[in-house]
């Protein structure tokens, strides 16, 4: 039998600088039910900005 993937869900991290840049990652919904916010590098404006979680369509 194949092993289940579990509670990990793919998410998109969208730049708060409104550049349209985003990262994709996975997170465990059981351990982290709140929306993820993380500071990452935005190569469009070449600065570190806050990235906020959005659903992948």
From Swiss-Prot:
Annotated HAMAP family: Ribosomal_bL33
Q: Which GO terms describe its cellular component?
A: cytosolic large ribosomal subunit
Looking up InterPro entries in the UniProt record yields: Ribosomal_bL33, Ribosomal_bL33_CS, Ribosomal_bL33_sf, Ribosomal_zn-bd
Listed GO biological process terms: translation
Transmembrane as a keyword of this entry, yes or no, is no
Task: Output the Gene Ontology terms for molecular function.
Answer: structural constituent of ribosome
> From the record, what ranges are coiled-coil?
none
Q: Name one Pfam family in it.
A: Ribosomal_L33
Entry keywords, A to Z: Ribonucleoprotein, Ribosomal protein
Its name, as the record gives it, is Large ribosomal subunit protein bL33
* Domain of life according to the entry: Bacteria
Q: What family is this protein classified in?
A: Belongs to the bacterial ribosomal protein bL33 family.
